[in-house]
Structure formats: C-alpha cells, structure tokens
Design a protein with these regions (language model features):
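Polynucleotide-recognition surfaces of large bacterial nucleic-acid defense/processing enzymes
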Residues: 11, 15-26
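Short, solvent-exposed micro-motifs at the edges of structured domains
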Residues: 22-24, 28-59, 64-449
Length: 449
C-alpha cells in the first residue's frame, strides 16, 4: 500500500518558475543585471569545472628488532605525496610589479638627488602599465571584481625517518622513546585563513610554484621520552616500611620539537595586484640575523621634501622613484608599493617546544580494603617559555582579552602577524604575540575502597 500526501506547492502558480532561474518574482534581496556582461563584471567567485578530490599517496618501509629480553627498536621510513590539494587564489588578478618593472629599495649607496630626478621609472609608471587583470579574464569581461577561487592545484611531499625504542614493564621500569627527522614541502597550507603565520594566498597568482617551500606544518625534529618507574623495593616488607619507603611511582615525559615555519610579510600590496595577503618582504643578503627594517620613500624634487612620506606615496606617485631601508643591516626589509619582494615563503623558524612534565604518586595501604593514593603533577616543570603559535587569523590573544605570558610577564597584544612584519618594533619577538603558560602544579588525592 502506498500513501501520497498532497502538499500545495508555493511555486505552482508561478509561470516558467524554473526557466526564469528558480527565483520568485519581486526584487527582494536579489540583485539583477541588465545583461550578461554586467553579470560577469560583478562576479567575485569562481568555481573551477575540473574540481578534483585531494589525494594522498603513502609508502613506508620499516624494520623491528627485539633485544635484551625487554627492549624493542623500530626504525621506519615514511613518505607521503599530496596532490590536488586546495589552493585559494584570485585567478583574474595580475601583478603590475614584475622583475623588469619595479622600484628599487636601497640598503646603502642611496643615489644622489640628481640621480633620483633622472630616474626613468616612478610609481606612476607602474600603476599605469596595465589594469591589473589577467588578459584572458579581461577579454572575457571578468574585470569588475577580484575573482576568488579554490582550485585543486596544490601539492606536497613528505619524507620522514621515525625511530622508537620501547622497554616493556620490567623490574618496575617502562620506557617509550621516539625521534623523528622529517621534511615537509608544499605550496599552500592555510587556504582557509586559519593562521596569519603563513599567507593564505600565493604572492603571484600566476606563479604558484614560486610559493613552494618548507610547509608551515614542517617540524624537522621531534623527540619524546616517557618513563614510568614503579619503585620495586619493599614489596615484601611489613606494612609500615612499605607505606613509608615503598609504593612510589614516578612518570616523567619530555618533549622537544622544532618550531613552526613562518613567512615574513610586508602587510601591504607591494606588487600592486589588488591583494596584500601574500606580499612578502625584501631579503638583504648582507643582513644580520632575523632583523627587520621599514623603509622611507625616495622622491624627485617635483614635490617638497616634507611631502615625501610613506603616507603620501599614492598621493604623489609620479614623484616616488624608490625606497631606502631605515636599517641597512636588517635581514628583512618591508616591500612598499611598487617594490619587488624577494623573500621566499616560510623562511623564519619559530620558537621550539621544549617541555618537561612529571608525575609522582605515593600509595598508602590502610587495610586490605582501604587504600589512599596521593599524587603531584607538574606541567612545564622547568618553567621554559613555550611560545607556541596560537589563535585564529587576524586576532592575537591580546585582542581576545589582554593575555600575559606567565613566564616572561610580557603583555601579549595584537595579531601574530605583527611579529612577522619587519617595519614593526616587535618583529621576531614572538613573546609579544604568543602566550606561554608558566609551570603549574596539580595535587590529587584518591581513596580506594
């Protein structure tokens, strides 16, 4: 038996409902366009027709050996190849700045005023060199908005050597130690803007290969050691001796991991492609350490010297012919409007994890039925600063309520990206943007009956 429920359709009396796009009559919140050309110009999202599911190809080879009755050693090689990975891109925008058309940034030997006046290229030369739209999209009419797309063009490769030593519980001692040496390379990681530490889009939308580098997920070294020591003595002693000197358990855990790779960013649309998310910095080959510098504009005498400021660069583009670093010894220099960024993706290594936790437990036997267990747990026992990257993109812990690094007592303020922009005073000062938990002790008491 079948039952049919007759439900009146809300669109039954609308002629040609599907033929007209499946939208009810009336404007409501729906935008209409006079023709297809206007619709194309207003388009801001692109769905590629050849979407492919991400794939992971894995291979491994390992050997395991047992020795000395209680020990097992395992050594493995692990490889992973990722293809068709998601990449966020703006497919219709092109760089106006190119290797053959850019404003120079000087660290020393700044040209004389006469040489600046004779410069054949100024910022306006670059701004007027094109409309910043890829010719194919321009010809098709997709030139009114940035055309954001998620395309399956990403790739990654991982190679790792993993070792693990295990001692089974014997004579009161259990041990598990592991060390991994690995390298992960990719050309995109944070396509959904889950972090500010590595850009969510590539710097040049027409050259994804230029973003191939150490992945933000690449932690080259990782070592862990976990012990459980159940003190085996006094097991056969009388109750008093066993309760006073025996029944101890100690369980330390140590973890070391190299830091996260991060990208030095200029925080400005230096390559003039309409997007500042991926713009990086200029690397000074003679720079010292991980140091940063801002820039000042170099102008012709077409404007007064007092008007030659960063704030006025776009107001007087015909007079701006270059930039000079405020700190010529810095390794990373901000790329300003029209400058050519030369820094690769993920070239700054963040602080490592260096953590030691420990647990101590003392058991007391009152009677055969009643037992008491007292425990002490110590987290970050050695009180090492653990400036671990955190927080959603665009909001550092300071923005979420004024956190403070408990170890250093330094205020945590602003977005983590602030420590990656060389023109800022907190460049490479991760303690200013990452929280760190101080040593913490936890007591526990358990009664068994």
């Amino acid at each position: 038996m079948s039952v049919t429920e007759n439900t009146p359709s809300l669109t039954a009396n609308i002629p040609n409902f599907l033929a007209n796009g499946g939208l009810p009559p009336g404007t409501g919140g729906v935008t209409t366009f006079p023709d297809a050309a206007a619709a194309r110009a207003a388009t801001s999202t692109y769905y590629p027709p050849d979407v492919k599911d991400p794939k992971s190809i894995d291979w491994t080879l390992g050997v395991q050996h047992s020795f000395w009755n209680d020990y097992t050693l395992e050594v493995r090689y692990i490889g992973t190849r990722g293809i068709h990975l998601d990449v966020q891109s703006i497919v219709n925008l092109a760089d106006l700045v190119t290797p053959s058309l850019f404003l120079p940034t000087y660290t020393n030997n700044v040209p004389s005023q006469a040489a600046l006046n004779a410069s054949p290229i100024n910022l306006n030369t670059i701004l007027s060199s094109g409309d910043g739209v890829v010719p194919a999209y321009d010809a098709a009419g997709f030139n009114g908005n940035a055309l954001t797309a998620f395309i399956p063009a990403g790739s990654s490769i991982y190679h790792g050597l993993a070792t693990q030593l295990t001692r089974r519980m014997s004579h009161g001692l259990q041990l598990v130690g592991a060390y991994t040496y690995s390298h992960l390379i990719d050309n995109s990681t944070a396509d959904f803007h889950t972090t500010d530490l590595t850009p969510r889009r590539q710097q040049d939308f027409e050259d994804l290969n230029a973003d191939r580098s150490n992945s933000a997920l690449d932690h080259r070294h990782r070592f862990t050691m976990a012990l459980v020591y159940d003190e085996p003595f006094f097991k056969g002693s009388n109750a008093f001796t066993r309760n006073v000197l025996g029944n101890w358990e100690i369980a330390p855990i140590y973890t070391y991991q190299t830091g996260e790779w991060m990208t030095a960013q200029s925080g400005i649309d230096a390559n003039l492609n309409g997007d500042q998310a991926g713009d990086r910095t200029i690397t000074n080959p003679a720079g010292v350490g991980v140091t940063g510098s801002g820039v000042v504009p170099l102008c012709t005498t077409a404007i007064p010297a007092s008007e030659c400021t960063l704030a006025n660069v776009l107001n007087f583009p015909s007079a701006v012919v270059g930039y000079a670093a405020t700190n010529p010894s810095a390794k990373y220099i901000q790329a300003y409007y029209g400058a050519l960024a030369t820094t690769g993706r993920n070239t700054i290594l963040g602080p490592p994890t260096n953590n030691f936790d420990a647990t101590a437990i003392k058991r007391f036997t009152i009677t055969e039925r009643y037992k008491v267990e007292f425990g002490v747990q110590a987290f970050n026992l050695l009180n090492h600063p653990q400036f671990i990257p955190c927080c959603a993109a665009g909001a550092g812990p300071g923005a979420l309520g004024g956190a403070t690094n408990a170890v250093t007592a330094q205020a945590v303020t602003g977005s983590p990206r602030n420590a990656l922009e060389p023109q800022r005073g907190i460049f490479d000062n991760f303690s200013a943007v990452f929280p760190s938990e101080a040593r913490a002790l936890q007591l526990s008491l358990k009664i068994f009956f």
